[in-house]
Amino acid sequence: MNALFSSTSRFSFSALALAAMLAGCAGGPRYEQPATAASANWKEQKAAEGWLPAAPADALDRGEWWKLFGDATLDGLAGRVQVSNQNIAAAVANYTQAQALVRGERAALFPSVSLDGSGKRSGTVGGSSTSSPSNSFSASLGASWTPDVWGRLREAVSSAQANAQASEADLAAARLSAIGDLATNYFSLREADAEIVLLDETIQGYQRAFDITSNRYAAGIAAQTDVLQAQTQLVNAKAERVGLQRTRATYEHAIAALIGVAPADFSLPAAQWTPTVPGVPLGVPSTLLQRRPDIAAAERSVAAANAQIGIARAAYFPNISLTASVGSSNVSRVKDLFSSSNTLWGLGLSVAQVVFDAGAIAANVDSAKAGYESSVARYRQTVLTAFQAVEDQLTASATLAQQEGLRREASAAADKTEQQLLNRYRAGQVSYTDVVTAQAAALSARRTLVQLQVNRQTTAIALIQAMGGGWQAGWMDGAAQAQPATSPATR
């Protein structure tokens, strides 16, 4: 008896040791964030330093970056976007779905319990008078559990969690994109308002010039061509104003769609526009890895793909499941269901191992590895594209700031030239063709200056978006610096 017990103990210990050894071989590779080529500083940062207004380092920490522009109307519209924008609503639903999938994967780690019951009353039709109907009741309580010996379920949970975090980042990206589009369309609309005001003033000036040429023609001291040229300038300016009304309506319709209402139910009255260009804290390139939602989402996709390798590898090992049940069946009275004499119980263990699959599992593992490498490449490209976007907007910010000073100077000179030539025309010193040329140049310079000012604002918006808009991946707080990814040969 002792020998049998000793033999059984040795067998049990060997089985446990083998299971532990196999469990150590199972599971996916340890995840390490892929390395990226992040420079210490931005290439165009020095070029932009003299042209970007200073801002405190925590200016964007709340994520309400649009408030940096100091426009109360924009602030109100941004609030409506966050509540009613349908792209954001879809991203919220996707995130909620991803969280539910995490809960579903995590539930597989625990046993499931089921309760079954049935009752039946039966008898014969047209039978003898001695036969009577009979009752039959059954009830059972069952439990089943698949222990996660090889880590497949844990890897599935890890993959689902990473996908949920990627979905969270996608939600942040949707908010950033929607409010960025709102701000861009809003300031473009305000720029159209400013151009309309400018054209109204220009039309008044052209009307006065037309009256002057008409009076001179009536007095016989000017040619009819002068009147026709003045009329052409006046009518063209009016046509330009009509075109700006169409442009403004287009921006207004875009804003309506962004805040989730039909264009027919939304209008934005004209208002004075202040071309404020806010300060944008730059930080260093490495912080972009945590502050840009698209980068964070791409990195989480890498983590999810890494977990898929573990799931694929777990198929090499046997599936183990445990079952237990207790219950009674075919009793005539309900109270007898709980009688010990009628109770049956059972315990079960099942093990299933694939013996031959013609390389299907190996193919799935190779597919998972390739999927991982693909996600790493997409992540690195996302990082590079993000760095490019920041550098582009830094260059644009510096260039446009320098251009504004020059354009302002050019506009002032063109205005002065227009006025001087008009005075000389009144004195009969120049032809009206010279006045027309000066008027066209002055109007072009004024409109170019206004357009450049809104370009500076939209460039600031693009730079804020490129920097992540103040968002930060919460799951990366305190994370270690990125380490080189494991080579494909060792995964």
Feature locations, PLM:
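Bacterial N-terminal signal peptides that target proteins for export
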Residues: N2-S14
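C-terminal motif of bacterial Sec signal peptides marking the signal peptidase cleavage site
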Residues: L22-G24
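Bacterial Sec-pathway N-terminal export signals of envelope proteins
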Residues: A26-L101, T274-A303, V354-V355, R380-V383, ...
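Small/polar, glycine/serine/threonine/aspartate-rich low-complexity segments that form flexible
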Residues: P53-A54, L60-L68, L74, S118-G142, ...
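Sec/SRP-type N-terminal targeting helices
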Residues: A89-A90, R106-A107, P147-R175, T225, ...
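Periplasmic alpha-helical coiled-coil/stalk elements that build and connect Gram-negative outer-membrane
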Residues: L153, A169-V284, A396, L400, ...
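A short glycine-centered flexible hinge/capping loop motif at secondary-structure junctions
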Residues: Y217-I221, Y425-Q429, A466, G470
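Short terminal targeting/anchoring segments
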Residues: A223-T225, Q429-V450
